[in-house]
Regions:
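Transmembrane alpha-helix interface/packing and boundary motifs in multi-pass membrane proteins
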Residues: 214-218, 249-258, 290-296, 381, ...
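Hydrophobic transmembrane alpha-helices that form the pore/transport pathway of multi-pass ion
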Residues: 227-295, 301, 305, 314, ...
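Conserved, well-structured core domains of diverse proteins
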Residues: 1-117, 124-128
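Membrane-interface helix termini and inter-helical loops of multi-pass transporters
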Residues: 52-56, 109-117, 186, 190, ...
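Membrane-water interface regions at transmembrane-helix termini and the short interhelical loops
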Residues: 49-53, 76-86, 111-112, 130-144, ...
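Membrane-interfacial loop-to-helix junctions in multi-pass transporters
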Residues: 121-125, 193-206, 232-245, 277-283, ...
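Long, contiguous bundles of hydrophobic transmembrane helices that form the permeation core
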Residues: 2-32, 38, 322-425, 528-617, ...
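Core transmembrane alpha-helical segments of multi-pass membrane transporters/permeases
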Residues: 136, 141, 151-153, 160, ...
């Protein structure tokens, strides 16, 4: 049974997540070579994090990209029909080229730095090879969307009647002088504004380390701990299995950063339980997908987006975590509200307590695994150490702490397997970050972000609300089919400057873009997380996507709330104001949930549902008058619903 379940999970991952379509070597020699290569990659990054080795920035990033490219061409076949049992002859050539690039960078580092982007012929050749390797690697892992975006941006950089390689002017606001191939490649290859830019810096440090941490935690049983705690706490309550799905997916999703992998991992367990107590196939799948997407919005790791956000904005990581916490929790609260209301409406009970794990026994068995998490929180927020150093020390502590009990004890083979899995798991994220570097590099070279900001503001007629709506649509379109990291970077590069120019706080603008880029995973027609959940539940994929939008509707409103009211992000506020804003936001989210479900204490008619929605929208703004009106509608709804519920009870008794 376990084997069958594993095969199903692998098939689902491969169907909806291209990065899972890896080679499976028959020859044990290839397997061993890949294992030792992966271990080398992991040990290098751990040594860098420890401070034992510290090459110059450009050298380190080129080594990181070179290693990741080498692993990409070793484990990812070129095409779906290509053999997964052996490495194709042309991949050996690509692997050799992947090694040559960082060697060239290492040997010629000082000369490249001295040229300051004025690339010579050899630089141009090496840079061209690097760009081609990155685009091909991204195509194999993420599909065509991300590489095509990168290619379009490169063509845009080359266009220009004055100096461009392509002597055609870009029309309107996007006009620029144009660049020749050597200038473009020099910018992308030989400085830290292109491929070796911010996104690769984050993947070579923060992302890699937290993936190692996640793999170690997974090996020592943290996944089972999360599941057992979630089902022990919530499984017996009304609609319990759905609440379990939310808790488990949220906890796991905050660490692993992949909505689809999260759906498959947690959904394989929770979706059948939801169906068993009476939730529909589509609703069960939607709960899993919306909760899994939310994991990327939930601190502390947020699918690694928090680290890139901190680097891009030049602020401390803990500021991102603090700001993102309340909106993410409110998002999950909105899902749980709908789960509770649906369970009450359809009279769906929880699971019998005698069938559930005992919370006390689970804590007794796994309590020590909370020590590394608490230590990580201390290192990130209070110690004064860098995030990199804190993550490295947490990894070491986790390995030691896991040995304290036999249930979590890891052998050397287990640790080795976690290190190998870490290197493999990093490949997809790192390649996406490298490819996104092309977009960032072209944007900085051509001034694209300034032009795009002007275009969005012009389209919105300088209206903040219209600009937010256009930005939302842009982010969701750009985020379709992309992993969370490139989706965030591309959307924030293209759309955030417009919001900032209108006076929105940079952090609020970045989070706004990030939220809607993530929601592309549950929004048809390319709702990959919803479709993966439908594959488990057996429901209709499109209907699952539509139900997912309904469940996540509060999440679509929350970004507007924190843009209009930065206090929700705990910016420029005190504790009392923060509590007030959080409470009014929760009230608004509950009104949305009741309106969507058409149920409170009893069924809600269409007129009352519209009134509830109006109350929720009134609570978006932080003005006292609108808050009082919104809360007034909430109180009136409680009063009216209780009267109607009592009346129904009397009629039923009669």
């Amino acid at each position: 049974m376990a084997t069958e379940k594993t095969i199903d999970q692998k098939a689902l991952l491969e169907e909806f997540e291209r990065e899972s379509r890896t080679r499976n070597f028959v020859n044990p020699i290839f397997t061993k070579i890949l294992k030792w290569t992966a271990l080398l990659v992991t040990f290098y990054h751990l040594a860098y994090a420890s401070g034992y080795i510290r090459p110059e920035t450009l050298r380190h990033r080129s080594i990181h990209v070179g290693m990741i490219l080498l692993m990409t061409f070793a484990i990812y076949p070129a095409f779906k029909r290509s053999s997964r049992k052996v490495i194709a002859w042309y991949d050996y050539i690509l692997m050799i080229l992947s090694v040559i690039i960082p060697v060239y960078m290492w040997v010629n580092y000082q000369a490249i730095i001295d040229r300051v982007g004025d690339a010579n012929l050899t630089d141009v050749i090496m840079g061209t090879i690097l760009v081609a390797l990155v685009i091909e690697a991204a195509r194999r892992i993420t599909g065509w969307a991300l590489p095509v975006i990168g290619i379009i941006f490169m063509i845009y950089a080359l266009m220009g009647a004055r100096q461009g390689l392509i002597p055609i002017n870009v029309p309107g606001l996007f006009l620029h002088r144009g660049f020749k191939w050597p200038k473009l490649i020099g910018h992308l290859f030989s400085n830290t504004e292109g491929i070796y830019g911010t996104s690769v810096n984050v993947s070579s440090t923060y992302i890699f380390l937290f993936i190692v941490f996640g793999e170690i935690m997974n090996k020592c049983g943290m996944g089972k701990f999360f599941n057992d705690i979630a089902i022990g706490l919530a499984g017996h309550t009304k609609g319990g299995p759905a609440k379990v799905a939310v808790i488990a997916a949220g906890l796991l999703g905050s660490i692993n950063g992949s909505a689809i992998a999260n759906v498959v991992t947690t959904g394989s367990f929770t979706i059948p339980l939801m169906k068993k107590i009476g939730y529909s196939k589509e609703f069960s799948g939607a709960v899993s997908s919306t909760a899994s997407v939310g994991g990327q919005l939930l601190p502390p790791i947020m699918g690694a987006a928090a680290f890139i956000m901190a680097e891009t904005l030049g602020i401390k990581y803990k500021e991102i975590v603090v700001a993102a916490a309340i909106p993410a929790l409110i998002y999950y609260l909105g899902i749980i509200f709908q789960i509770q209301l649906r369970a009450s409406k359809d009279k769906l009970d929880g699971m019998p307590k005698d069938q559930l794990p005992k919370v006390k026994e689970t804590l007794k068995m796994y309590w020590h695994l909370t020590i590394p998490i608490l230590f990580l929180v201390y290192m990130l927020f209070f110690s004064g150490y860098t995030v990199i150093k804190g993550a490295f020390l947490t990894i070491l502590l986790t390995i030691i702490i896991a040995q304290l009990k036999k249930e979590t004890r890891m052998s050397l083979k287990d640790i080795e397997a976690a290190f190998v899995a870490s290197a493999k798991s990093t490949v997809s994220v790192a390649i996406a970050c490298a490819c996104v570097g092309i977009v960032i590099g072209v944007s900085s070279l051509t001034g694209f972000t300034i032009n795009m900001a002007s275009a969005i503001i012009s389209l919105g007629g300088k209206s903040l609300l219209l600009t937010l709506v256009f930005t939302m649509v842009t982010c969701m379109l750009l985020g379709m089919g992309l992993p969370s990291i490139p989706a965030y970077i591309i959307t924030v590069t293209i759309a955030a400057p417009a919001l900032i120019e209108l006076g929105i706080a940079p952090l609020a603008a970045h989070l706004f873009c990030f939220y809607f880029a993530m929601f592309a995973n549950i929004t048809p027609p390319v709702a990959l997380a919803s479709f993966a959940a439908a594959g488990i539940s057996g429901g209709n994929p499109m209907k699952t996507g539509i139900v997912s939008i309904k469940l996540a509707l509060a999440g679509f409103i929350i970004p507007y709330m924190f843009v209009y009211n930065n206090q929700l992000l705990l910016m420029n506020t005190n504790i009392l104001q923060g509590i007030q804003v959080a409470i009014t936001a929760c009230v608004g989210v509950f009104l949305i949930s009741a309106a969507v479900e058409g149920y409170f204490h009893t069924k809600v008619n269409i007129f009352m549902r519209l009134v509830m929605l109006a109350g929720a929208f009134l609570l978006i703004d932080s003005a006292l008058l609108t808050d009082l009106a919104g809360v007034g509608i909430f109180v009136a709804s409680i009063f009216i619903q209780r009267i109607l519920a009592r009346r129904e009870a009397r009629h039923a008794a009669a």
